[in-house]
């Protein structure tokens, strides 16, 4: 059985720590991004993790980087574990170019839930997208909607774009 990886300790200079990913400085303008198995919801990181979540998140990122190749550039250099680092990083790390990011969170909603439900109750819309009257919490939406927002730091409110 694999171990749930919620704490990542490397002998590298930390660059940033998010709710799920930790990023470390490498040489020559490169960073090492590591996806942990930490679980977060509604701005809370829970003490228990989900086994292999980091590998799944990394594979999802790689899928989209490949799918969007030729359409939009990305920062990916390699998915190999750098020499001298622990084997538990296999499948959960990416060496990337250090770039200026555009902090946008892209959400596709298929169901009326969470902050979308709260918005709908107040305005009949989610992120300015008018929806039919009479929907209930957890209702399936007539069609998925795209609701991008700024990616807020912990404790700050996001802004719908």
Task: Explain the meaning of each model-derived region.
Residues 2-152:
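Active-site loop/lid in soluble adenylation, ligation, and acyl-transfer enzymes
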Residues 159-161:
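Conserved small/polar residues in nucleotide/adenosyl-binding loops
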């Amino acid at each position: 059985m694999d171990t749930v990886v919620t704490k990542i300790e490397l002998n590298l200079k930390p660059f940033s720590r998010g709710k799920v990913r930790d990023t470390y400085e490498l040489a020559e303008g490169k960073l090492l991004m590591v996806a942990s198995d930490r679980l977060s919801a509604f701005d809370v990181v829970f003490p228990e993790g989900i086994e292999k979540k980091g590998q799944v998140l990394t594979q999802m990122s790689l899928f989209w980087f490949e799918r969007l190749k030729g359409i939009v550039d990305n920062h990916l250099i390699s998915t190999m574990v750098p020499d001298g680092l622990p084997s538990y990083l296999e499948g959960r790390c990416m060496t990337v170019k250090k770039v200026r990011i555009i902090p946008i969170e892209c959400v596709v909603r298929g169901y009326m839930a969470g902050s979308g439900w709260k918005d709908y109750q107040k305005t009949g819309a989610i992120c300015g997208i008018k929806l039919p009257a009479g929907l209930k919490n957890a209702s399936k939406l007539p069609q998925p909607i795209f609701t991008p927002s700024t990616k807020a730091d912990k404790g700050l409110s996001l802004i719908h774009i």
